[in-house]
Every structure is written in C-alpha cells, then in structure tokens.
Design a protein with these regions (language model features):
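Pre-Walker A-like glycine/lysine-rich segment at the N-terminus of P-loop NTPase domains
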Residues: 1-48
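A general secondary-structure signal for short beta-strands and their flanking turns/coil
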Residues: 8, 21, 79-81, 120
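Conserved P-loop NTP-binding catalytic core
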Residues: 29, 45-102
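Extended, charged alpha-helical "arm/stalk" segments used for dimerization and assembly
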Residues: 114-132
Length: 139
C-alpha cells in the first residue's frame, strides 16, 4: 500500500542490526526529535537510515541505502535489518498505525524494492551541504 505523503508520520524505527546499532528502538512521539550522542554512537547511521525510508512524491530527494551504506572490503552490510513504524490519518481523521515496514540486506541488494516505500518528501542536510552553503555565502 502506498500512502499519500502528507498523511504519513514516522512513529518508531527499530534497528535490529545496522553498522554499530544493534537492537535499538527510537520512538518519535513529538513533532521534533533530537538525535544526540558522543562520537561513534550511531547518530549519523540513524540519520542516513531515516533518509532512505521513503519515496519522494516528485519534489523530495530519493535516497537509497547504497548511497550511505556502500559495500566495501570491510563491510557488505549483509545481515543489516531495520523496521519503520508509520502512522496514517484516515479520511475520518482517525490515526492508524501501519504494520512495521522491514528494510534489510540479505545478500547483494537491499529490500524491499524502493518503489514500494511509503511516499513522503525527505530532504537530507548533511555537514557537506551546510559547509558548501557557508562557502557560497562568504564568497
């Protein structure tokens, strides 16, 4: 089921295994969530995974897992697994939790197929984006 983008909200993400994250659940119960921690605690892993959960509606950015989790000699990412729990608001205004959407890499490719991801615009702003903007402003 593909849901209209403005009616879907991420409520929870569960990392079974992704990089250094193992059996970690993050709940998104408020409109704004801060991802904080010491260096190496997995903040960037969380942000990269969040950027890959959705299909854009045509205006957003289309991030895919290999963009951030590139296979290399040290890590193929095989065995990685996470789940996202989304909520939709029905036409009657009643919120409904959707079944968890599982994302994983069993062998050589990530699943599920990208076209089956829920629709929601995502804009990833990394440190490189911020630095390039600052350089452009100062010129």
């Amino acid at each position: 089921m593909i849901v209209e983008m403005n009616k879907i909200t991420l409520k929870e993400i569960r990392f079974k295994k992704l990089k250094g994250l193992s059996n970690v659940t993050i709940k998104f119960s408020k409109p704004l969530t801060a991802i904080m921690g010491v260096n190496g605690s997995g903040k960037t892993t969380v942000i990269h995974a969040l950027a890959c959960l959705y299909n854009p509606d045509g205006n957003g950015e289309n991030h895919i897992f290999p963009e951030f989790f590139t296979p290399n000699t040290d890590a193929s990412w095989s065995g990685s697994e996470l789940e996202a729990v989304n909520e939709i608001i029905g036409t009657d205004g009643v919120p409904t939790l959707l079944p968890p959407k599982k994302y994983y890499k069993a062998f050589d490719r990530w699943a599920p197929r990208y076209q089956t991801r829920p629709k929601r615009n995502v804009y990833y702003i990394g440190i490189e984006t911020c630095l390039l903007s600052l350089i452009h402003i100062s010129e």
